[in-house]
Regions:
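Short, conserved loop/helix-junction motifs that constitute active-site signature segments
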Residues: 85-89, 116-119
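Short beta-strand/loop motif that positions the catalytic acidic residue
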Residues: 88, 94-96
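Conserved loop-alpha-helix segment in the C-terminal half of the alpha/beta-hydrolase fold
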Residues: 96-129, 135
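Short aromatic-enriched loop/helix-cap "lid" or pocket-rim segments at secondary-structure transitions
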Residues: 27-32, 106-108, 136-138
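Active-site nucleophile elbow and catalytic-triad environment of alpha/beta-hydrolase enzymes
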Residues: 68-84
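Catalytic active-site module of serine/aspartate enzymes centered on a nucleophile-bearing elbow/loop
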Residues: 121-155
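Flexible "cap/lid" loop of the alpha/beta hydrolase fold
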Residues: 1-44
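Active-site micro-motifs of SAM-dependent methyltransferase domains
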Residues: 23-24, 94, 131
């Protein structure tokens, strides 16, 4: 969403943090992984609370509609970006975890290819952690994001 906003309205976006996402296309096992994750989340008390906090009392309907929309995108191989990435001028941080089991297995390679396409990108991959990276290690993610926003190197 943030990448598309920056592509459409760069005047409104100073930086983009793209955490734990598949990249330009949804990976081959996306539909199966999404269905499993969403069904598991519906049974998990913490996830149910999170969804309700984010979406309101009708969270389950919202999650089901979002799930179906993503499945349709995957089946139809719908492009995920509204414009070519080459047109993105906004500084972008591609961040993720090498242990993320929700995203494509070649996430780092996809991030490198996207970084090659954009004019102002950085990549940071955590060695450990799940999905999304920002929840796996919030303090380290906050440091990386702050360094990126301040134009510092990402160590």
């Amino acid at each position: 969403m943030a990448v598309n906003t920056a592509l459409k309205r760069p005047d409104l976006v100073e930086h983009v943090i793209a955490d734990s996402f598949d990249g330009r296309t949804l990976h081959e096992g996306f539909v199966e992984n999404l269905r499993k994750e969403r069904e598991h989340a519906k049974q998990d008390h913490g996830a149910r609370q999170f969804y309700e906090w984010c979406q309101g009392e009708d969270w389950e309907k919202v999650v089901d509609l979002n799930t179906q929309a993503l499945i349709t995108c995957a089946i139809n191989k719908t492009p995920l970006f509204c414009k070519p990435l080459e047109s993105l001028d906004t500084p972008i941080l591609f961040m993720g975890s090498l242990e993320d089991d929700m995203c494509r297995q070649d996430m780092l390679e996809e991030y490198k290819e996207m970084d090659r396409l954009v004019g102002n990108g950085k990549i940071y991959m955590f060695e450990t952690g799940g999905h999304p990276a920002v929840l796996s290690d919030a303090e380290s993610a906050a440091r990386v994001i702050t360094d990126f926003l301040n134009g510092q190197s990402l160590n």
